[in-house]
Amino acid sequence: MTFLAIDVGNTRLKWALFDAAQPGAGLLAHGAEFLDHIERLAEGPWSHLPAPRHMLGCVVAGDAVKRRVAEQMELWDVPARWVVPSAQEAGVINGYDHPTRLGADRWVAMIGARHRLLAQGPARPLIVVMVGTAVTVEALDAEGRFLGGLILPGHGIMLRALESGTAGLHVPTGEVRLFPSNTSDALTSGGTYAIAGAVERMYQHLRQHCGQEPACMMTGGAGWKMAPSMTRPFELVENLIFDGLLEIAARRFAELPA
């Protein structure tokens, strides 16, 4: 039973075809397209794929993108199904004031991270960091309850904001330094340490709240940039959203008639 997982972010659509809708399924194919190029999927990379039995995705870019993806999926006559955050799913409890207003990507990544943690050993508090166009830092207790999270700009947004709002500053490529001694390095280091500082602060909050050292998982296209600057042990995971979609799909599609 092949399964298509789709993660639509702020700038790109990422997809992966698995040989089953369950955790640990084998990866058959994967790819990514910028949102402006979604219409290429059916006649391009998807044209050579076997028809998936089911599809499940998460999207932060709005209903218009959902419609565009659904049009591409007419290639297979497979309905497009999307995750909507709820009060509880796959063993994770949603502590947001209004659960359905939580970003679907955040919700799915937390589910993926929680089950990845449980597969490694006993339950413990967990910090989940996604580093992309925006950065999110989530806190879950040992029972799988989402307590709350932070949202802050990613590297690119920070640098563009400084460029547009500050006279004479342009956005060159710099390095992360302990003591930056030029503008390029100062900009890059400032953004990196801002993100690392947010993670550290949430780590301290969660440790104090739970009385236990949290685990930390990081994902997202720019996660590798943060690795050398992190002060706590962490696991860098290629795509927690796909992990979460597999967990959710295993439960949802098992309930559907064959």
Curated annotation (Swiss-Prot):
GO molecular-function terms, A-Z: ATP binding; pantothenate kinase activity
Classification lineage: Bacteria, Pseudomonadati, Pseudomonadota, Betaproteobacteria, Burkholderiales
Pathway the protein acts in: Cofactor biosynthesis; coenzyme A biosynthesis; CoA from (R)-pantothenate: step 1/5
Location in the cell: Cytoplasm
The protein's assembly and partners: Homodimer.
Protein name: Type III pantothenate kinase
PANTHER family recorded: TYPE III PANTOTHENATE KINASE
Name of the gene: coaX
The UniProt record lists the keyword Glycoprotein: no
